[in-house]
């Protein structure tokens, strides 16, 4: 999205000063926003896949929230502290294609440090904005709960996760393919125009 200064600036999720904005994060996201804006007309299929992913995440969110409510508050080693997490390229493509708010910083932390978005009440980020690795993660305790509920429950949940993962790959492939195709056919990329 273009700001008042004419530069492409993605909508950043409200920070309220809790998590520091990093210049590199902002520059990287502005570059992605600019690239996608230039090619937006050719990205209809990728945007449609991103919308399917959003619907899948919206369906998955209450299921995962119910699972987390049974396990996370009792966990002696929360995954938000023990695991290294990051927002990957597909996460960013998804957010940018749908013009969803971008988290104020990368989610990475040093091993043993808590995720910068962890609060006393769980994740500060809205479910759609969270890294996919967080959305789809099922810890061993949660797997045990699912297995106690029976194979159909576990299979249905894992099937939803696998379906979203396949769509994430398809979305990325579609973006790369469309941008490559447009670059090959654009007049500015031809040898005759570079002289």
Where are these regions (language model features)?
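Short loop/turn segments that flank or connect secondary-structure elements
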Residues: 1-194
């Amino acid at each position: 999205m273009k700001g008042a200064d004419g530069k492409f600036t993605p909508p950043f999720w409200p920070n309220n000063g809790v998590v520091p904005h990093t210049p590199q994060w902002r520059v990287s996201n502005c570059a992605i926003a600019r690239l996608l804006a230039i090619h937006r007309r050719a990205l209809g299929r990728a945007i449609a896949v991103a919308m399917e992913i959003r619907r899948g995440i919206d369906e998955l969110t209450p299921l995962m929230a119910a699972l987390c409510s049974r396990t996370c508050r009792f966990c002696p080693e929360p995954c938000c502290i023990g695991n290294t997490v990051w927002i990957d390229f597909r996460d960013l493509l998804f957010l940018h294609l749908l013009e969803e708010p971008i988290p104020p910083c990368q989610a990475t932390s040093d091993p043993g440090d808590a995720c910068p978005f962890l609060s006393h009440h769980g994740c500060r980020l809205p479910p759609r904005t969270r890294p996919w690795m967080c959305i789809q993660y099922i810890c061993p305790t949660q797997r045990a709960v699912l297995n106690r509920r029976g194979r159909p429950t576990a299979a249905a949940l894992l099937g939803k996760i696998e379906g979203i993962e396949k769509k994430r790959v398809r979305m990325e492939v579609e973006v790369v393919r469309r941008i490559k195709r447009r670059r090959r056919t654009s007049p500015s990329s031809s040898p005759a125009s570079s002289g």
